Every structure is written in structure tokens, then in C-alpha cells.
Amino acid sequence: MSWQQRVDDALTARRATDTLRRRYVVSQGAGRWLVANGRQYLNFSSNDYLGLSQHPQIIRAWQQAATRFGVGSGGSGHISGYSVAHQALEVELAQWLEYPRALLFISGFAANQAVITALMKKNDRIVADRLSHASLLEAANLSPAQLRRFIHNDTQHLSRLLQSPCVGQQLVVTEGVYSMDGDSAPLAEIQHIARRHHAWLLVDDAHGIGVTGDEGRGTCWQRGVKPELLVVTFGKGFGVSGAAVLCSESVADYLLQFARHLVYSTSMPPAQAQALSASLAVIRSDEGRERREKLAALVQRFRAGVNASRFTLLNAHSAIQPLIVGDNSRALRLAEALRQQGCWATAIRPPTVPVGTARLRLTLTQAHEACDIDRLLEVLHGAGE
């Protein structure tokens, strides 16, 4: 088979199963409204949960820092790209989440890959929730360690896997809030089991940080859990982009030596780091608390209004509200029907989710109003699917 034939066959297979992904060009993609092709839609696909991507204080911080530092960092943090803005943000994050250290990464994907790749060796084992993010599972598959997956949120299965003999070290991997199902992991029980088997715990709290817990400290804080490795990302609750790993002093020093994504990547722009510090200040403030409370009320309003006889609504109380429709083509038709009525929603299909669980992944944000939720419910129930 030629290279071209391989490419063509893969694309043909995706088209045949209604799983071909595509991008949409938008004029505005974050916030209450999405604008595409000159039309305005209520936006139910954004990760900007607290509406901070449009916050004037954060925008101003980025602009002022860009004037001071320029638009790029100029190098890896190990060469010339670790500015006072980066250092300040790392200190603020560590103090906020009560960890000895925080290390910045250019993305959550990079952070997860870097940590797992740097830590795991040939005789080690990774035990990951089977619905863990692609960045975690890909890193685990690429590492020399053995990967075992436990049934989603099934702590008994996790315990059985950890009990089997392992010559090296074991790492338990889970998310705080799951990106496709919107539910939360039983973190306290998972941590208890991990410690009983002398395993370390890595929690990716991309969808919880900033949005849940006291001062937005996330799912782990809310559950009274402190994993050895906490990954937080900044493209959701923070409204910007990037990520950080919270850990001990020695692990931070280790990652600075062996995390290749950190050593060999140009660091995020200093202006971005300063904008993230401004975002953190909003998240920790009374305004941040009010934004979280409003979002929680909108989620409750949506869940109370969904017709459960027509849609499978998962046990998700986060900003992520998936409606399971099962069939790929039905999910695509439903998403298109919503767009025709002015509501932008995304159909999620395999391989992102398991076969037979195609869904509308609806995300609610603080930027929405109660009338927006009511309109979404009206359109959903009249979609004819």
C-alpha cells in the first residue's frame, strides 16, 4: 500500500462511518455568542466557562505586558524564556493551591505528555481510567511502562489492577471532571486506594480548576484530595491557554531536568503569563465567586428542563452537559438542527467517545443568561429527532 493509499483509505473509512472531523471558521468563538458566516449563534460549545476570555481586566493585562515584553518569550525557559512574569505566576499558583512548586507548560496536552514521559520507566505500570483524556492515554501508550485501564470511576476494578504484582512503580491517572461525560471522579476513594498500594496519583483537573471549589481551587480541593501530581490548564476556567503542573520541590527539579516538552519548547509569551495572573486574581475574588454561582444556577436550570424521555442525560453537574443520542448520523443531524435555530452545539462521535455513545456535547458558561438556556431547551425539544 502506498502512502497516498493509506491516507485515502483512512479518510474514506471516516466518511463512511460519519466520524470525519471538520473545522469551522468563526469570527467570534468564545463568549455568549459565536459568529460564523455572518450569522450569530448562541454558543454552547465553548470551554470559556467563566467568560474570562473577554474580561477587560485580563485583556488589559495582556496588552500592557505585550508592550513591555513583546509578543513572544524568545526561547525555552532553560535558555532565555523564563521571565519575571512566568516566575510570578508559578509562585501565585503554588501558593493558591498549597503546593511547594508549580511549573508552566504551553498546553495541557504537553504537560500530561511531559510528566508521564519523564517519570515512567520500563518496569512501571500506569493504571488509568479508561475515559482519561487522549493526552494522558497517548502518553501512557508511548511510554515504556505497562498501561492498564480501569472501568470508568470503578474503584474496585482500580484496586484489583493495583494489587497485581509490579516490579517498578505504579501511577494512577484520572481526571477531576471528565471532558466528554462531564462527571467527576471519586477522588477521595481513588487516592485512598493509590496510597494503600504505594502508587502516586496524577489528576488532570482541566475542567474543574477555576470553576469548582473554594476560590475556584478545583475538584481536588473540593474533595479534600492532594495528588502527588496535579495538572491544571488555563484554556477553560481561566479563559486563556497553557497549563501548569503542581508538585513537590524534588519532582519539580526532576521535571526541569527530564521533561523534554519543557526543556525543548519555547515558553509561553510573558504577556500570556501576566494575563493568567490577572485571570487568577479574578477567579479568587468575589467576582469570581459570583461567576461560579451564576454558572451553577444555569447548569441546574438546564438539567431541570431537559426532557429525559428523549435524551440520555448523564450524571454531570459541571458546565459540560452531554446529551447521548447513540447514532453518529443522528448526532450530526441534531447539531445541524440546532444551528438552523440559532444554537451552536457540537456533535461528538467516535473515536473521541466509545462507539454507540455519539452525543451533543453542550457546554454552559457564565456568559449565558437564563433566557439562553430556555431557548436551548425549546430548540432541543422541538428538533424533531
Swiss-Prot record:
This is 8-amino-7-oxononanoate synthase. PROSITE patterns: AA_TRANSFER_CLASS_2. Its EC number is 2.3.1.47. GO terms for biological process: biotin biosynthetic process. The gene is bioF. The modification N6-(pyridoxal phosphate)lysine is found at K236. Pyridoxal 5'-phosphate binds at G108, F109, S179, H207, T233. Homodimer. InterPro entries: Aminotrans_II_pyridoxalP_BS (IPR001917), Aminotransferase_I/II_large (IPR004839), AON_synthase_class-II (IPR050087), AONS_Archaea/Proteobacteria (IPR004723), AONS_Proteobacteria (IPR022834), PyrdxlP-dep_Trfase (IPR015424), PyrdxlP-dep_Trfase_major (IPR015421), PyrdxlP-dep_Trfase_small (IPR015422). Keywords: Biotin biosynthesis, Pyridoxal phosphate, Transferase. Gene3D superfamilies: Aspartate Aminotransferase, domain 1, Type I PLP-dependent aspartate aminotransferase-like (Major domain). Substrate binds at R21, H133, T352. Pathway: Cofactor biosynthesis; biotin biosynthesis. It catalyses: 6-carboxyhexanoyl-[ACP] + L-alanine + H(+) = (8S)-8-amino-7-oxononanoate + holo-[ACP] + CO2. One of its GO terms (molecular function) is 8-amino-7-oxononanoate synthase activity. It comes from the Bacteria. Catalyzes the decarboxylative condensation of pimeloyl-[acyl-carrier protein] and L-alanine to produce 8-amino-7-oxononanoate (AON), [acyl-carrier protein], and carbon dioxide. Belongs to the class-II pyridoxal-phosphate-dependent aminotransferase family. BioF subfamily. Its cofactor is pyridoxal 5'-phosphate.
